[in-house]
Structures are given as C-alpha cells and as structure tokens.
C-alpha cells in the first residue's frame, strides 16, 4: 500500500524546516514541499537540497512573482487597501496565492493532505485554511503548530539542533521574518514589548532615516487606470518597477512601519514592517486619485478601501465579496491616469507635483487672480439652499 502524501508550504524557516520531519514521522507519509517565489530576497537556491535533507520526498519551486504583482498587488493598490490605515498587506496578499499554488501542486501530485506552518494564534492559519477550503474542500488540512509538543521558539530550535536540521533562527537571533516583494514583516524577540524601539538589526533592507543620504531622491511615477507603468520616464514591468522602488526607497529610509494591529483571532500584536515600494506607490496613487476622482466617488471609496483591506487581512481573497468590490474599484480607476512626482528624504515621502489628462482641477475656477471664472454671486443662493434645512430646524426648536 502506497504511503499518503502531504503537500506543505515550505519556506525553509524554523517552523517549516522541523515540520517536514515531524509530519513524516507522525503520519509515515511522503512530504511534497512547495516553495513559492514571491520576490523574497533571501537565498532560495539551496531550499531544495535543504528540504530533501530534512526528509521531503519532492520539492516544488514556483515562480509566482508576475502573478503576485499583476493579480494581487495591483488589485490591492487600486483599491487603496491599507489595513487599519497603515499596513500594505504584503504577507496577507501573498498567502492566498501561495495557498492556491499548494493546492494546485497537491492535486497534481495526488496528495491527500495539506499542511502549513502557521501558529495557533496567528492570522496566517486562517488565510491558508480558508483558501484551502475554498479551492479544495475535500483535502484534509494539518496544522502541526497547533498540536505538536513544542511550546516556544527555543524548544523548536533545540529540536532542530537535535536532529541536525539547519535553521537560521537562534537564541541570539529570535526574529520571525516573512518577506515578499511588497514588504517584510518582523516580529518576536524584544519587539513584543511595545515600549521598546525596534533595534537596527531587526530591519532587513531599509537604511535608518538618520543615516540616509542628505540629498533627496526625486522619482516620477506614471499610472494608467490606477496601475503604475513607468518610473522616471522608463516603461517597465510591474515587477521591475517595484524592485527598483524598493531599492530607491530603502536607501532613503522610506517604508518603516511600527504598528499595533488587531489580529483575526482577537488579540492585538505589535508588528514591524518594511515596505518601501508599497509606501511610495500608495502615496502616489492616493494623490492622483485626489486629482482625478469626482468628490463623492473619492470619499466613498475610502470605505471600500477599508473593506477591501479587511477582506485581504482576514483571509477572504477568494470570496464573492472581494470580486464584487473589484468591479467597483475597477470602475473608479478609469480616470486614474497621470504622472506623480515625489521627493524621498530621510524616511519621508512628500509630493512635488501631479498631472493628468483627466484632472478635475480647474485653475481658472480655483484661482484668486483676475483670471478667476468662478461665479461668486451664485454663492449666496447656494448657501441659502444648502443651509435651509438647519435654519428651519433651528427656528422650530428655538421657538419651543
């Protein structure tokens, strides 16, 4: 009788490294390790040999970067999705795509089970398992971190050392790091105390603002229907544009985020993020929307932005609601075409200029010079009608 097969999400980190051996021993199963390239900078060429050495029978490496940018990141950017107005959702956006890739691999390899290395009090367990249920409800899902005997990262490290499993986490380097092209999340260690400033060694790519260049960097980003298409006058793919903005932003200390956020499971957590390109692009996109969107659309879209961010954060990417919101967002983005010029300086992003063929800014109406075409006399009648309801209310209630 052939062994059962388990497809697992494999990153090469502490949890998934020891998970291979633990699952193999517990279920006497073959392990198919799946790694998705979402633009992480850490070395990935040695992951296959590491997974096999740890006990996996097969390793699948999938380059998901193009799909990640075009089908996930750009949708979130067009929606203006920032969780609780801060987090650009790098990890949260990557999880449904990675989970989908694991399901596809599992079905192709004849696996009967899926496994992830998410903790029992984190968000990612929800994101993976809801996606698994959406795409392959017939496959059994295993969550080793919710049931195994290890109670701390220290005990996991000890298990790894006992079984000669190579891991980068040590008691001297206790950070848990997740990375993709849209951002890096850093947690654990001293970061769990919200009164402790993040040590410099916690940051992975960004220069400290104090040590950033004394000369500002100026960038020009061109958008077409809400999607960035060129940087400094050069047309480029979305992937290349994000990579370049990450380099420029990181060098200038842009994109460091420190927040207390509300997790799906009901607790608050302290998270450190590095997201240079995401910070720059969300800022530029929002300023172009200010120029091109009609007032009621611009103001209402803020509600949609938060709803969209919540959907991503809560693991509901494949829900009908997300698809329905996409239809609204896509309609709003038709005029969001134009150029935005920004200054990046010592961690800050500031606006230098913007223009668009669909600009709703009319200088002749806005100016206070003699070229003013605004009908000032019309204001009196407008104000009378605009305030008539409150005037009537006041007259009635004052009289009583």
UniProtKB/Swiss-Prot annotation:
L-citrulline binds at residues 87, 123, 127, 176, 185, 261, 273. L-aspartate binds at residues 119, 123-124. InterPro entries: Arginosuc_syn_C, Arginosuc_syn_N, Arginosuc_synth, Arginosuc_synth_CS, Arginosuc_synth_type_1_subfam, AS_cat/multimer_dom_body, Rossmann-like_a/b/a_fold. One of its GO terms (biological process) is urea cycle. It comes from the Bacteria. Keywords: Amino-acid biosynthesis, Arginine biosynthesis, ATP-binding, Cytoplasm, Ligase, Nucleotide-binding. Its EC number is 6.3.4.5. It is an enzyme of class 6 (ligase). Its main location: cytoplasm. GO terms for cellular component: cytoplasm. It holds the Pfam family Arginosuc_syn_C. Pathway: Amino-acid biosynthesis; L-arginine biosynthesis; L-arginine from L-ornithine and carbamoyl phosphate: step 2/3. It is found in: Cytoplasm. ATP binds at residues 9-17, 117. GO terms for molecular function: argininosuccinate synthase activity; ATP binding. It catalyses: L-citrulline + L-aspartate + ATP = 2-(N(omega)-L-arginino)succinate + AMP + diphosphate + H(+). Belongs to the argininosuccinate synthase family. Type 1 subfamily. HAMAP family: Arg_succ_synth_type1. This is Argininosuccinate synthase. It comes from Pelodictyon phaeoclathratiforme (strain DSM 5477 / BU-1). The gene is argG.
């Amino acid at each position: 009788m052939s062994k059962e097969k388990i497809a697992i999400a494999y990153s090469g980190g502490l949890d998934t490294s020891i998970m291979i051996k633990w699952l193999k021993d517990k279920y006497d199963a073959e392990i198919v390790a799946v790694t998705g390239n979402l633009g992480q900078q850490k070395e990935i060429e040695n992951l296959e040999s590491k997974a096999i050495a740890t006990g996996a029978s097969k390793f699948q490496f999938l380059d998901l970067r193009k799909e990640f940018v075009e089908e996930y990141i750009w949708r979130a950017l067009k929606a203006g999705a920032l969780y609780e107005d801060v987090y650009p959702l790098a990890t949260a956006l990557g999880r449904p795509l990675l989970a989908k890739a694991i399901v596809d691999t599992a079905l192709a390899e004849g696996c009967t089970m899926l496994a992830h290395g998410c903790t029992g009090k984190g968000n990612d367990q929800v994101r993976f398992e809801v996606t698994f249920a959406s795409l392959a409800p017939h496959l059994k899902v295993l969550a080793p971190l919710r049931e195994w005997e290890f109670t701390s990262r220290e005990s996991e490290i000890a298990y790894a050392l006992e079984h000669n499993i190579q891991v980068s986490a040590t008691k001297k380097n206790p950070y848990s790091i997740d990375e993709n092209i849209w951002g890096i999340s850093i947690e654990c260690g001293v970061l769990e105390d919200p009164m402790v400033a993040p040590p410099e060694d916690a940051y992975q790519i960004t220069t400290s603002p104090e040590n950033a260049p004394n000369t500002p960097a100026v960038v020009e980003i061109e958008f077409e229907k809400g999607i960035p298409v060129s940087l400094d006058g050069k047309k480029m793919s979305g992937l290349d544009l994000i990579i370049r903005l990450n380099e420029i932003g990181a060098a200038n200390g842009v994109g460091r985020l420190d927040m207390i956020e509300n997790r799906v499971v009901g607790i608050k957590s302290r998270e450190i993020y590095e997201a240079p390109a995401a910070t720059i692009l969300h800022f530029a996109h929002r300023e172009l929307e200010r120029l091109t969107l009609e007032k009621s659309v611009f103001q209402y879209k803020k509600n949609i932005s938060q709803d969209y961010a919540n959907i991503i954060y809560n693991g509901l990417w494949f829900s009908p609601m997300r698809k329905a919101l996409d239809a609204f967002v896509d309609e709003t983005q038709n005029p969001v075409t134009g150029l935005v010029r920004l200054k990046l300086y010592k961690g800050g992003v500031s606006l230098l200029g913007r223009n668009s063929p669909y600009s709703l800014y009319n200088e002749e109406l806005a100016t206070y010079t003699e070229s003013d075409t605004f009908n000032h006399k019309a204001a009196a009648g407008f104000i009378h009608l605009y305030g008539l309801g409150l005037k009537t209310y006041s007259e009635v209630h004052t009289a009583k």
